[in-house]
Amino acid sequence: MQAATETIAAIATAPGRGGVGIVRVSGPLAGRIAVEVSGRELKPRHAHYGPFLDGGGQVIDEGLSLYFPGPNSFTGEDVLELQGHGGPVVLDLLVQRCLELGARQARPGEFSERAFLNDKLDLAQAEAIADLIEASSEQAARNALRSLQGEFSRRVHALTEQLISLRIYVEAAIDFPEEEIDFLADGHVLGLLEKVRTELSTVRREASQGALLRDGMTVVIAGRPNAGKSSLLNALAGREAAIVTDIAGTTRDVLREHIHIDGMPLHVVDTAGLRDTEDHVEKIGVERALKAIGEADRVLLVVDATAPEAADPFSLWPEFLDQRPEPGKVTLIRNKADLSTEAIGLEESADGHVTITLSARTNAGLELLREHLKACMGFEQTAESGFSARRRHLEALRLAGNALEHGHAQLIHNGAGELLAEDLRQAQQHLGEITGAFTPDDLLGRIFSSFCIGK
C-alpha cells in the first residue's frame, strides 16, 4: 500500500441542490478533521448525527459524520464522510473548513486513483465506477456493476494465468535445451495455446458488446438515391432531422443524429445515395458515405422494395462490398413496403444475414428494426452475463490476440520456441494494461482525470 502524504477533500455528490450532499476526505489528516468538524471523537464505521462546526465553533450544518480508518476504506486511507444538506453553499463551506484544517482540493478521480494505487481495486474496476455513474440504460448499468465487482478483471486474470503457465513451460524448454523438448511433437504447448486463444476470442466478443452498450453503436444508413434513407433516419429519430424529397440526390453530405432506444445510445449516420455522378459536390458526398460505411458498427443497406434492382440488393453498388464491414454487420432494409405487396417482417438466412421489410413513411415494421438494433448492441444479455468495457480495453485485447496469432504461426511453421516466448510475453503485457499491472503513468492520468471530482 502506498502511503499518501497529502489529505484531499471534495464534494462527492452531483452539482446542484438536493436533499443530501456529501463531502469526502481522504488522507492522514482525516481523523483530526473529523474531530474538529464534529466536535468529538468518532467511533470508526459508525454514523454520528450532530453539528458541523466552523473554526469559531459556529454551526455550518447538521448531519451524519462517518469515519473509516485505513486500510478498511474505499481509498485504503483514513476516510471521513460528512453527509449534510445538499445545498451548494453549505457544501462549499464544509469543503473550505476541511481545507483550513490542512486538506487540499481533490483532483477529478483522485479518490478512485488512490484506491487503485492502494490495491483496493484494479484499473478496470476503477473505470467501471465512472461507467456506472454515466450508464444510460439498465443493461449498461448492470454491465458496469459486474465490472466494478470484478467480473471483467477475473476474466483477464484467468487469461493471464494461462499465459504464465504457458510461458513457464516454453521458457523452461528454452533454458534447458538438453531436455530436447519438441514443441510440436509434444502437443502440450499447442493445446494450451489453442485454449487461451479460444478464451481470448470469447472475452473480446463480450468486451465488444460491453463497449457498444457504454459508448453507443454507430449505425450507417446506406443505399441508392431515393431508397428512403433519410425517411428511415427521421423515423428512428422521431423528428424531421433530414430533408426528404422525391428528387434523387437530395442528401449530399453525411448527416449525424444521436438517438436513444430504451436508453441505449445510438449514433445514426445518413449518407448520400450511392451512384455514379458527374456532380462534384455529390461525388464528395459519395466518398464520405463509403468512408462512413467502412467505420460503422452496423450498416443498414436500404433498398426500394418496389424497384426491379431490389431482387439483388448487394449488386447495386460494387464499391459497397469493398467498404462495408464483415457481412454479419450488414442488415438489409427493404423499404417502401406500403407501396409493394411484401409483408412486414424480419427474416434471418441460414448464414446469419438479416432482412427487415418495413415502411419508413408509415412506421410499419419500425419496431422490428429497433428490437434488432437493441439485440445487436447486446441488449438481450441477461443480468448474469456481460460486463462493461472501453475502447482502450478492446485495443489491448486486439493486440494480445495479434501476439498470440503471431506466436502460433511461428510455432506451426518454424517451431520457434524463442519467438513464441516473446509473443506470449507481449500478450501478457497487453492484458496487464487492462487491469493496470502494466500501465504508463500518463495513461493513468488521462483515465482518472476524466472522472468526476469527489470520485
From Swiss-Prot:
Catalytic class of the enzyme: hydrolase
How does the cofactor attach, per the note? Answer: Binds 1 potassium ion per subunit.
**One example of a Gene Ontology biological process annotation:** tRNA wobble uridine modification
| Superkingdom of source | Bacteria
Record's protein name: tRNA modification GTPase MnmE
Principal place where this protein is found?
Answer: cytoplasm
Quote the cellular component terms of the Gene Ontology held in the record. Answer: cytosol
Entries under InterPro entries matching the protein = G_TrmE (IPR031168), GTP-bd (IPR006073), GTP-bd_TrmE_N (IPR018948), GTPase_MnmE (IPR004520), MnmE_dom2 (IPR027368), MnmE_helical (IPR025867), P-loop_NTPase (IPR027417), Small_GTP-bd (IPR005225)
GO MF annotations for this entry? Answer: GTP binding; GTPase activity; metal ion binding
**Cofactor(s) named in the record:** K(+)
Annotated EC:
3.6.-.-
Protein family membership: Belongs to the TRAFAC class TrmE-Era-EngA-EngB-Septin-like GTPase superfamily. TrmE GTPase family.
Question: Where in or outside the cell is it found?
Answer: Cytoplasm
Arranged from A to Z, the UniProt key words for this protein are: Cytoplasm, GTP-binding, Hydrolase, Magnesium, Metal-binding, Nucleotide-binding, Potassium, tRNA processing
Gene that encodes it: mnmE
**Record text on subunit structure and interactions:** Homodimer. Heterotetramer of two MnmE and two MnmG subunits.
Tell me where in this chain the TrmE-type G domain is found.
216-378
What does the entry list as the binding residues for GTP?
226-231, 245-251, 270-273, 335-338, 359-361
Question: Would I find DNA damage among this entry's keywords?
Answer: no
Keyword Lyase attributed? no
Residues engaged in binding K(+): 226, 245, 247, 250
Main function: Exhibits a very high intrinsic GTPase hydrolysis rate. Involved in the addition of a carboxymethylaminomethyl (cmnm) group at the wobble position (U34) of certain tRNAs, forming tRNA-cmnm(5)s(2)U34.
Annotated Mg(2+) binding lies at 230, 251
Record: residues binding (6S)-5-formyl-5,6,7,8-tetrahydrofolate: 24, 81, 120, 455
